C-alpha cells in the first residue's frame, strides 16, 4: 500500500511538473498582497505591499522593463515603516535609473554595542519583563532617499553613480513595560563612547561612484551567471560638519547551475570598509546597497545579511560577510492561470569585522564606575551560522520566503525565524 501511495504521489508531481510551463507575461502585472511576515528581532509584521512589473511585449520575460514597489507595515515589537521603489531599465535610453524613499521607526531598536564580541552580552538584561530591564534597546528613526544611475561601458560592464540622503534620529525608548533609566545607549554616552554632538543622530549626504557587472540569466531568480558591484562612498556630515568619511563597498554573487532550472549553488561575498575620515556612530549599522529593494538595510545580522545572528549584533567600521546556499526547486505547478515554484534552500553564512570602531576608547572606558562591563578581551574571528529556508515563487518575480537560522556563537546569535518577500541575494 505504501509503495502504491508513493508511486501515486511521484506520478502526480511528475505530471504537475511536466505540465507546468510558465507562460510569458506582457504589459503591466501587479500583485497586491498582505504583509503578514515575521522576524525574530522585530516580531510579527502586519501591513501590505504591492509590486508592479512592466514586461513590454514579453520578449525578455521574466526580466522586467519597469518595477515599482510600495509597502508599509507595523510590527508587534514596536516598529513601523513605509517604503517605495522605482527601478527602470528603459525610462532613459541605454541606462538604468533607480530611486527609493524609506521611512523606518524602530521604537525597540537593538543596540548591543561596538565591535562584536568585544561588547559583552548579558541575556538577563535584554527585555527582561520580571526586572523591567531593556538594557540593549533604544529608539531609532531613519529617513533615507536614494537615486542611482547605471550606464553600459562595454558588454555587461557598467559604470554607476548615485546619491543618498539619510537622516537618523536616536533617543531613549519609551515602553510602558520597561524602564529606560539604565541602557547601553546611556552608558555609552556617560563615558563618551558616544559623543554628545552625535548622540541624537544627524543627517548625511552620500555620493557614490563605481562599476557593476551583470551576466545573470534572470535577475530576481538566477539559474546561472554572476553579478558584482564595486564602488566608493564619500559621506559628508551635514549636521555636525565633522564626521566626513569614505568607505569601499564590494558585493559579488555567483550562481552555479548543478541541474539547470532545478538545482543551483549560489553564493554571495560582501565587503564594506571605512578607509578614510571618521564615521559617526549612528551610521555604523547602515549596509550600503545600490538598489534598496526593501526597507531594512541596517545591521549585520538577521534576515538580510547574516541569518542566525541578532539584528545589529555586529557594529563596526568595517565588515566582511558571505552567504552560501543550495536552491532546490522541488515542485512546479500551474494554478488559477498562474505559475508556481516551490524551492528549498539550506544555507551557511559567515561574517567578520574588518575594522573596529574607536577601539582605543572602547578599551579605555571598558568598566563603568558601578562595575558594569562595556568591553571584554576577545579574539577576532569568523562567525558562522546555518539553517534552512523555503520559497514559493508566483510567476518567477513574486516570492514568499521563510528561513530559520542559528549562529554558532551564543554571545552573538540566537535562533532566528524570518519571513520576507525576496531572496537574500
Regions picked out by a protein language model, each given a short descriptive name:
Residues 21-29, 56-65, 91-97, 154-156, ...:
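Short loop/turn motifs that connect adjacent beta-strands in outer-membrane beta-barrel proteins
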Residues 23-30, 38-203, 304, 411-425:
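Gram-negative/organellar outer-membrane beta-barrel architecture
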Residues 30-32, 46-48, 80-84, 141-147, ...:
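Hydrophobic, lipid-facing positions within transmembrane beta-strands of outer-membrane proteins
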Residues 36-38, 48-52, 68-74, 84-86, ...:
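Transmembrane beta-barrel strands of outer-membrane/channel proteins
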Residues 37, 53-55, 87-91, 150-154, ...:
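Structural signature of outer-membrane beta-barrel channels/translocons
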Residues 69-71, 130-135, 192-197, 234-240, ...:
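Extracellular loop and loop/strand-boundary signature of outer-membrane beta-barrel proteins
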Residues 174-190, 195-198, 203-205, 262, ...:
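Outer-membrane beta-barrel transmembrane domain signature
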Residues 218-336:
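C-terminal outer-membrane beta-barrel translocator/porin domains of Gram-negative envelope proteins
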Amino acid at each position: 500500500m505504501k509503495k502504491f501511495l508513493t508511486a501515486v504521489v511521484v506520478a502526480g508531481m511528475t505530471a504537475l511538473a511536466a505540465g507546468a510551463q510558465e507562460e510569458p507575461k506582457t504589459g503591466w502585472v501587479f500583485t497586491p498582497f498582505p504583509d503578514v511576515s515575521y522576524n525574530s528581532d522585530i516580531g510579527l509584521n502586519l501591513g501590505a505591499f504591492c509590486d508592479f512589473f512592466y514586461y513590454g511585449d514579453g520578449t525578455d520575460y521574466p526580466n522586467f522593463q519597469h518595477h515599482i514597489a510600495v509597502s508599509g507595515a507595523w510590527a508587534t515589537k514596536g516598529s513601523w515603516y513605509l517604503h517605495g521603489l522605482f527601478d527602470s531599465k528603459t525610462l532613459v535610453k541605454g541606462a538604468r535609473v533607480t530611486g527609493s524613499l524609506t521611512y523606518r521607526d524602530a521604537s525597540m531598536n537593538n543596540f548591543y554595542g561596538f565591535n562584536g564580541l568585544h561588547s559583552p552580552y548579558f541575556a538577563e538584561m535584554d527585555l527582561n519583563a520580571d526586572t523591567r530591564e531593556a538594557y540593549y534597546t533604544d529608539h531609532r528613526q531613519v529617513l533615507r532617499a536614494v537615486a542611482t544611475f547605471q550606464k553600459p561601458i562595454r558588454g555587461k560592464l557598467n559604470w554607476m553613480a548615485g546619491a543618498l540622503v539619510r537622516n537618523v534620529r536616536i533617543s531613549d525608548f519609551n515602553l510602558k513595560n520597561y524602564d529606560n533609566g539604565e541602557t547601553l545607549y546611556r552608558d555609552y554616552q556617560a563615558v563618551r563612547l558616544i559623543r554628545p554632538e552625535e548622540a541624537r543622530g544627524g543627517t548625511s549626504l552620500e555620493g557614490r561612484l563605481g562599476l557593476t557587472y551583470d551576466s545573470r540569466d534572470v535577475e530576481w531568480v538566477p539559474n546561472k551567471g554572476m553579478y558584482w558591484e564595486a564602488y566608493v562612498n564619500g559621506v559628508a556630515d551635514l549636521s555636525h560638519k565633522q564626521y566626513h568619511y569614505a568607505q569601499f563597498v564590494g558585493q559579488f554573487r555567483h550562481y552555479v547551475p548543478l541541474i539547470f532550472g532545478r538545482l543551483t549553488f549560489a553564493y554571495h561575498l560582501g565587503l564594506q570598509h571605512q578607509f578614510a575620515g571618521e564615521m559617526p556612530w549612528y551610521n555604523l549599522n547602515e549596509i550600503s546597497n545600490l538598489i534598496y529593494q526593501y526597507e531594512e538595510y541596517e545591521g549585520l545580522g538577521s534576515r538580510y545579511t547574516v541569518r542566525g545572528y541578532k539584528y545589529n549584533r555586529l557594529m563596526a567600521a568595517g565588515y566582511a560577510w558571505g552567504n552560501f546556499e543550495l536552491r532546490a526547486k522541488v515542485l512546479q505547478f500551474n494554478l488559477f492561470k498562474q505559475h508556481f515554484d516551490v524551492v528549498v534552500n539550506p544555507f551557511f553564512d559567515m561574517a567578520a569585522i574588518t575594522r573596529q570602531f574607536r577601539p582605543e576608547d572602547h578599551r579605555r572606558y571598558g568598566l563603568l564606575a558601578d562595575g558594569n562591563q562595556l568591553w571584554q578581551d576577545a579574539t577576532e574571528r569568523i562567525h558562522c551560522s546555518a539553517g534552512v529556508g523555503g520559497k514559493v515563487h508566483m510567476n518567477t518575480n513574486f516570492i514568499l520566503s521563510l528561513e530559520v537560522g542559528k549562529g554558532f556563537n551564543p554571545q552573538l546569535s540566537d535562533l532566528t525565524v524570518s519571513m520576507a518577500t525576496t531572496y537574500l541575494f
